Amino acid sequence: MPVPPSASSGAQTETDTAALADAAAYVLRTVPEPQCGSVGGEWAVLGLARSGYGDAAWSEAYYDNLVAYAQAQDGVLHARKYTEYARVVLALTAIGKDPRDVGGYDLLAPLGDFERVTFQGLNGAVFALLALDAGGYAVPAAPAGRTQATREGYLAEILAYQTPAGGFSLDADGGDADADITAMALCALAPYSGDAGVSDAARAAFLWLSDAQGANGDFGSAESNAQVLIALATYGIPPEDAHFVKDGRSAFDALLAYVVPGGGYCHASADAEANPMASEQALLALTAVTRQRAGESGLYAMTGDAGTPHLNLDAADGANKEQ
């Protein structure tokens, strides 16, 4: 079981720098041949590219493998899970590749089909909006006879999954809110937080996350801590914000408690071995926090004019404005 570190400070520290370097080195070492996929693929590519630890030859190998896969599949990454396309768009945007021409296939185009994208519910809308906004892409035209997607439509779909308590649920009919999807929904909402209704929804979601945080600052797994840290950084909120420190410990401290020998991260505190997904999500979180501390754009904000929304968690409803 990993040993929890002491509480971190609000400024960039040697511990932060070393943690990011170790996480990046671990991913490079354990993913020698990146492929199209949620593990050993796009999240690793995104994390390494946005952290500054990316390797050009490694990224090119991913792209070549993706081209070969897309051509072998006739451009169909998945018949029903359109999050596959959104995830690929995020990775390609991060390494400077055009998702609209991957071996002759337009992998952005499926995000124009609102029905197919939202077949996966909240996940579909969140991933699609993140992907579209990451590169400032125009929403593709939907196929004939299908419902045309719009940014406004995806935004409304996401907000429909917010519970009265403020968190987001995977169940549109009022199921329990979940920290991971709440954090991801917050990232998708960020570019629209200049709207009073969106900023109020985001504030409510962050306050729900604050209440959901454990008494020791932990959200229950490496991946959950990572997602919350990414959401905080996206809004320019440091991990040490008073709303997210419990018993002197932040989610950043909690995440570092999941490090195992060798530089990887385990999924649960009782685990002794590194978990690939947890390690890649930790890399993303450490990248996001490092960028936030340096005053850089958020993890998913990859256009040149991308700013950082700033949210006052203590403001009254309607008082938040994007800065």
Report residues per predicted region.
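Preference for long, amphipathic alpha-helical scaffolds in soluble/luminal domains
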Residues: 1-323
